[in-house]
From Swiss-Prot:
Catalyzed reaction equations: N(1)-(5-phospho-beta-D-ribosyl)glycinamide + formate + ATP = N(2)-formyl-N(1)-(5-phospho-beta-D-ribosyl)glycinamide + ADP + phosphate + H(+)
Pathway recorded for this protein: Purine metabolism; IMP biosynthesis via de novo pathway; N(2)-formyl-N(1)-(5-phospho-D-ribosyl)glycinamide from N(1)-(5-phospho-D-ribosyl)glycinamide (formate route): step 1/1
Keywords tagged on the record: ATP-binding, Ligase, Magnesium, Metal-binding, Nucleotide-binding, Purine biosynthesis
Enzyme Commission code(s) on record: 6.3.1.21
Listed name of the protein: Formate-dependent phosphoribosylglycinamide formyltransferase
Family: Belongs to the PurK/PurT family.
Sequence positions that bind ATP: 113, 154, 159-164, 194-197, 202
Single GO MF descriptor: ATP binding
Length: 394
């Protein structure tokens, strides 16, 4: 792809659907290559909007609003960064010649756990936890009885761990169903019931489909709390056999989804047995560690790939870790304190996302640190993150 000049005739325009912290880093990397960036989200002053050329505040599940903005901006590429989008409309746009990253089908399938699980397990034959889908409480009771407890209950459409729970006793079925419905995104009333896997560890394998083939980043270990990313580190130590199988599964599912871009493939590993979990066709929360761990961050890799540019060699610079900085209260605006102490941690870097307000558990920043090994890096990242405090503006 030949690239134009921003704000001039012939500019290469990227429309970001979703403007959070991941979208912000994508916008920055795109602008480094002279791309004109338009950021879209449901609320004003979202992180990517603060660095984009223009922005729009709309519901991305409203196809008329999407149609209006796309018609106004006439982007070369539509780059979804979140799940809360009318993906059926993206399919129609793609059929009409609009380029959606990586493909509209990939975006549509992966926002729905039923679609991606059926693709991975039933079409591609990838090993997964035992599972079933239920569209009613009574149907869920039957599947829980078959799969057994403990099991994991998730809405088929949700993000950041919303609506997910571990069902440890059949008496909790009603509560798990209610929690799933409260956390579900969109109009779906279906859940997935999964066998509870006693895995040794879980990884994200960042997989890049680009003009010269498929490339892999070193595996990323991570910890989730209530289904949401809390810390990650790279590289995650794996046996050669487990890594080879992880790459095989990641390449299979990303090839089936198609298109160019970076995918976050989540996998469970137990005694070198690798089980497919989920895939996101975009930069991944756990991949924020690559801003310090690699020569090319996941965001630069994504931008290069979607623009049809070579990716080159991906190099791990040092054992590294990331740790989230979370709000613990609701404020309209905050100031950050403790930054001096945070940045006294050896090799540390901070990314404060610039979100306009806080609520308990909202991710407001991330600490990034290197170490002599991942254990040291994880300890440093935690110390750096925990030094940062948020206080309301008086």
């Amino acid at each position: 792809m030949n690239l134009g000049t921003p704000l001039k005739p012939g500019a290469t325009r990227v429309l970001l659907l979703g403007s959070g912290e991941l979208g912000k880093e994508v916008a920055i990397e795109a602008q480094r290559l002279g791309v004109e960036v338009i950021a879209v989200d449901r609320y004003a002053d979202a992180p990517a909007m603060q660095v984009a050329h223009r922005s729009h505040v709309i519901s991305m599940q409203d196809r008329e609003e999407l149609k209006r903005v796309i018609g106004l901006e006439r982007p070369d590429l539509i780059v979804p960064e979140i799940e809360a989008i009318d993906t059926e409309f993206l399919l129609e746009l793609e059929q009409g010649g609009q380029r959606v990253i990586p493909t509209a089908r990939a975006t549509n399938l992966t926002m729905n756990r039923e679609g991606i699980r059926r693709l991975a397990a039933e079409e591609l034959g990838l090993p997964t936890a035992r599972y079933a889908f239920a569209a009613s409480l009574e149907e869920m009771r039957g599947h829980v009885a078959q799969i057994g407890c403990p099991c994991v209950i998730k809405p088929i459409m949700s993000s950041s761990g919303k609506g997910q729970s571990v069902l440890r006793d059949p008496s909790q079925v009603d509560e798990a169903w209610r929690y799933a419905m409260e956390g579900a995104r969109g109009a779906s009333d279906t859940v997935i019931i999964e066998e509870f896997i006693q895995f040794d560890y879980e990884i994200t394998l960042l997989t890049v489909r680009h003009c010269n083939g498929t490339s892999f980043c070193p595996p990323i270990g991570h910890v989730q709390i209530k289904g949401d990313y809390h810390e990650s580190w790279q590289p995650m130590a794996m046996s050669p056999a487990a890594l080879a199988e992880a790459r095989r599964q990641a390449e299979a599912v990303t090839t089936a989804l198609g298109g160019y871009g970076l995918f976050g493939v989540e996998l469970f590993i137990s005694n070198d047995r690798v089980l497919f979990s989920e895939v996101s066709p975009r930069p991944h929360d756990t991949g924020m560690v690559t801003m310090i761990s690699q020569n090319l961050s996941q965001f630069e890799l994504h931008v290069r790939a979607i623009l049809g540019l070579p990716v080159g060699e991906i190099v791990n610079l040092a054992p590294s870790a990331s740790h989230v900085i979370l709000a613990d209260a609701s404020f309209d605006a905050v100031r950050f304190e403790g930054l001096e102490q945070a940045l006294e941690v050896a090799t540390s870097k901070l990314r404060l996302f610039g979100k306009p307000d806080t609520r308990p558990g909202r991710r407001m920043g991330v600490a990034l640190v290197q170490g002599k090994d991942t254990d040291e890096a994880r300890g440093r990242a935690e110390a750096c993150a925990h030094a940062v405090r948020m206080v309301p503006l008086s």
